[in-house]
């Protein structure tokens, strides 16, 4: 599907204009800031649109898009106005405009975000105008993708500076001078992206950290040994990695601190001042170029990359290394360095909340900008219908915005329906009755994979489905209503299982194995490297090592016996099942994004908090049309205090769609999908008949309560609503 757009009457093309934000608008009042909004007009066509008004700011953010039908000779005028003044007189409140002529439109479409300087409506106007507006023009087939590089200078009537964005996740205020993406002799970008060198007006020499942390931007690791241009470079200092962006720009990452830099750490900074003419010719396949500001960079046509470091300096370093050993190690980049070539990254923190924010940001960069992951199921057949629909989809489709609908119900999913779907689905797919999982022991109700699940011939496909559901929940910020064993989370992280992990799963076996390690077993035990287990009523034997039934356990080899026993206990008959589940999980959550977490943290990310802190709940509740001293509020909390843990969880599920609490607590409850921030639990006093039951709005975490006359009536109605009702509707 590569049609250029949707045409109307054969003479116009459909273009989606996105007005992202404006920067540094003129302040024309001494005591107050303007309320800016943008107006979009397709000149001569009658098409006119206005953005929302943003209050009291010189840097409004709109991020709104409009579909325009533009003819071959049409132009687009985008003007910014102060809503506080537009009613006073004609022309009042004008803050600047930009006009795109027809040739500018054809050249700017599908080139990413552009930052355009605002200008006066007429050159003779005396009012001061300043600032920029950030917009993009996309045809239908390119929405969500990047375009080719174009030279935008001279196309705009106001001749504003054009800034191109490298992708949807990169803010335009965080650009820096960087080596240009690799281009061949024709000037076409090798990476297929739309990022080229842009010189920031502030000359701020920093690159956005997210861009280098984005898994889509990281290129394969290139070592100097596999470069084909004939010269050998010294090894990188310990802790450094050489990486390449998708545009072919080489940078260096210090893995311990997370600091990135364009400067090659193998080259002392004083060598960069050497006269290029004194270094001799460039290696074969290399070319020297300069940025718009005159800074030199080097193009490697062999590897299709660009860099600031002169490749000839490696030859000097090799020669010096042959003459003498370095007297001191290379200096590591400092955490707070503000040198112009260093790319400061966020400090690595053990704080789980901070690491979770980084994970959420990385996942948001992978979410497609258009389309939905639509799932429609019935409550009666939720497991099988969800399985069939999820397994038909591609992983990239599952990353689109999640929209769930229960058949026969009219509820609109802005997050609440999806949370209830996951809650109900987990009760089915994790139920030991279905044979996929089992409890770790008879009296410990954490879940582990059932080694006898192969009784279902399609069990591997179902484990793949379970992995996808777990990944889907994490990707979209929801939680799985079920607890697995700690070793299960360690296996998901690729970490080895240890004897200490057995204590929480099988305390008796752990106690026995610890006794073996701590005591002399020679006169006591007569074991071999062969163990027995029960499978469908039959006693089967398993050799822990080849010919294990003939190898006795002694003081010398008992540590090996315990290690092999522990590994067998956790992986007995579940290797294929676990690999299928892990495959489904990693289709949505790449393995490298999980490296900063340990098993306890991963458990919280997947399952959230299962314990409800009543004080935290109370202190992070919003009241609407009532106050803390209102009878309804006091009676509500009195009722909650009388509930046991199970009923409190059911109440939370009734109002929010989930029994789980975010790891930050109730202050981080998520509301409607795509909301800018959390949405607190809300008690809303409504004017309604007191014979009605309380109503819940799961997308807004809100419960509507009529003005009941007594505590007893509120308790009865609330309990009935929580225990006896289900389903969604639209008011």
Swiss-Prot record:
Show the Pfam families listed in the entry. Answer: C2, HECT, WW
Q: Where is the WW domain?
A: 234-267, 280-313
Q: What is its main location?
A: cytoplasm
EC main group:
transferase
Stored InterPro entries: C2_dom, C2_domain_sf, E3_ub_ligase_SMURF1, E3_ubiq-protein_ligase, HECT_dom, Hect_E3_ubiquitin_ligase, WW_dom, WW_dom_sf
State the EC number(s): 2.3.2.26
- Ranges for the region named Disordered are 216-237
Q: This protein's superkingdom?
A: Eukaryota
Its Gene Ontology biological processes?
Answer: autophagy; BMP signaling pathway; cell differentiation; defense response to virus; negative regulation of ossification; negative regulation of transforming growth factor beta receptor signaling pathway; protein K63-linked ubiquitination; protein polyubiquitination
Every C2 domain range:
1-120
Residues spanning the membrane:
none
Reported function: E3 ubiquitin-protein ligase that acts as a negative regulator of BMP signaling pathway. Mediates ubiquitination and degradation of SMAD1 and SMAD5, 2 receptor-regulated SMADs specific for the BMP pathway. Promotes ubiquitination and subsequent proteasomal degradation of TRAF family members and RHOA. Promotes ubiquitination and subsequent proteasomal degradation of MAVS. Acts as an antagonist of TGF-beta signaling by ubiquitinating TGFBR1 and targeting it for degradation. Plays a role in dendrite formation by melanocytes.
PANTHER family cross-referenced by the UniProt entry: E3 UBIQUITIN-PROTEIN LIGASE SMURF1, HECT DOMAIN UBIQUITIN-PROTEIN LIGASE
Instruction: Note what the entry says on domains.
Output: The C2 domain mediates membrane localization and substrate selection.
What name does UniProt use for this protein?
E3 ubiquitin-protein ligase SMURF1
Which species is this UniProt entry from? Answer: Mus musculus (Mouse)
């Amino acid at each position: 599907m590569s049609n250029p757009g949707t045409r109307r009457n054969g003479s116009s093309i459909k273009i989606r204009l996105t007005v992202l934000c404006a920067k540094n608008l003129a302040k024309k009042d001494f005591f107050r800031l303007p309320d800016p909004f943008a107006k979009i007009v397709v000149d001569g066509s009658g098409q006119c649109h206005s953005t929302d008004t943003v209050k009291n700011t010189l840097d409004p953010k709109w991020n709104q898009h409009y579909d325009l039908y533009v003819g071959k000779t049409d132009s687009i005028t985008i003007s910014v106005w102060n809503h506080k003044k537009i009613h006073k007189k004609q022309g009042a409140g004008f803050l600047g405009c930009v006009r795109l002529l027809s040739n500018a439109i054809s050249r700017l479409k599908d080139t990413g975000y552009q930052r355009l300087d605002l200008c006066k409506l007429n050159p003779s106007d005396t009012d001061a105008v300043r600032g920029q507006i950030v917009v993009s023009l996309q045809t239908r087939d390119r929405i969500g993708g990047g375009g080719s590089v174009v030279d935008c200078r001279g196309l705009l009537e106001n001749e504003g500076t054009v800034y191109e964005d490298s992708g949807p996740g990169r803010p335009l205020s965080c650009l820096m001078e960087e080596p240009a993406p690799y281009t061949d002799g024709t000037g076409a970008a090798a990476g297929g992206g739309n990022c080229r060198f842009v010189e920031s007006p502030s000359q701020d020499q920093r690159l956005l950290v997210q861009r280098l942390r984005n898994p889509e931007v990281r290129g394969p690791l290139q070592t100097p040994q596999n470069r084909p241009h004939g010269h050998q470079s010294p090894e990188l200092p310990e802790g450094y990695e050489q990486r390449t962006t998708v545009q072919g720009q080489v940078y260096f990452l210090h893995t311990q601190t997370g600091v990135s830099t364009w400067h090659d750490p193998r080259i002392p900074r004083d060598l960069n001042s050497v006269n290029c003419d004194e270094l001799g010719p460039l290696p074969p396949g290399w070319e020297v170029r300069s940025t718009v500001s005159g800074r030199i960079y080097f193009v490697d046509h062999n590897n299709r990359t660009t860099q600031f470091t002169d490749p000839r300096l490696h030859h000097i370093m090799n020669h010096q290394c042959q003459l003498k050993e370095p007297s001191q190690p290379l200096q590591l980049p400092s955490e707070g360095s503000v040198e112009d070539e260093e790319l400061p990254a966020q400090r690595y923190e053990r704080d789980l909340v901070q690491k979770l924010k980084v994970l959420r940001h990385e996942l948001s960069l992978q979410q497609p900008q258009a389309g939905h992951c639509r799932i429609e199921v019935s409550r009666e057949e939720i497991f099988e219908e969800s399985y069939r629909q999820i397994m038909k989809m591609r992983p990239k489709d599952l990353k689109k915005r999640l929209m769930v609908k229960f058949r026969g119900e009219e509820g609109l999913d802005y997050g609440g329906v999806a949370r209830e779907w996951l809650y109900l689905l987990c009760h089915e797919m994790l139920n030991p009755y279905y044979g996929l999982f089992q409890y770790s022991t008879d009296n410990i109700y954490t879940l582990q994979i059932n080694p006898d699940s192969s009784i279902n011939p399609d069990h591997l496909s179902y484990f793949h489905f379970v992995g996808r559901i777990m990944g889907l929940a994490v990707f979209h910020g929801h939680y799985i209503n079920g607890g697995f064993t700690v070793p299960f989370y360690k296996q998901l992280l690729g970490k080895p299982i240890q004897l200490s992990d057995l204590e929480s799963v099988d305390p008796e076996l752990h106690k026995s194995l610890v006794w073996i390690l701590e005591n002399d077993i020679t006169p006591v035990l007569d074991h071999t490297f062969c163990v027995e287990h029960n499978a469908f009523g039959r006693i089967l034997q398993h050799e822990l090592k080849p010919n294990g039934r003939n190898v006795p356990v002694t003081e010398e080899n008992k540590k090996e016996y315990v290690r092999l026993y522990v590994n067998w206990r956790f992986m007995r008959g579940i290797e294929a099942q676990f690999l299928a589940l892990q495959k489904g999980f990693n289709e949505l959550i790449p393995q490298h994004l999980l490296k900063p977490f340990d098993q306890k943290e991963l458990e919280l990310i997947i399952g959230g908090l299962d314990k409800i802190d009543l004080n935290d709940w109370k202190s992070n509740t919003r009241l609407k049309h009532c106050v803390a001293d209102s009878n309804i509020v006091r009676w509500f909390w009195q009722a909650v205090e009388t509930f046991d843990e199970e009923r409190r969880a059911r109440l939370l599920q009734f109002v929010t769609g989930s029994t789980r609490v975010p790891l930050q607590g109730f202050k981080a409850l998520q509301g409607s999908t795509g909301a800018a921030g959390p949405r607190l639990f809300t008690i809303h006093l409504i004017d309604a008949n007191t014979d009605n039951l309380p109503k819940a709005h799961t997308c807004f975490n809100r419960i509507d309560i009529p003005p009941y006359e007594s505590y007893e009536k509120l308790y009865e109605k609330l309990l009935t609503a929580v225990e006896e009702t289900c389903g969604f509707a639209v008011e």
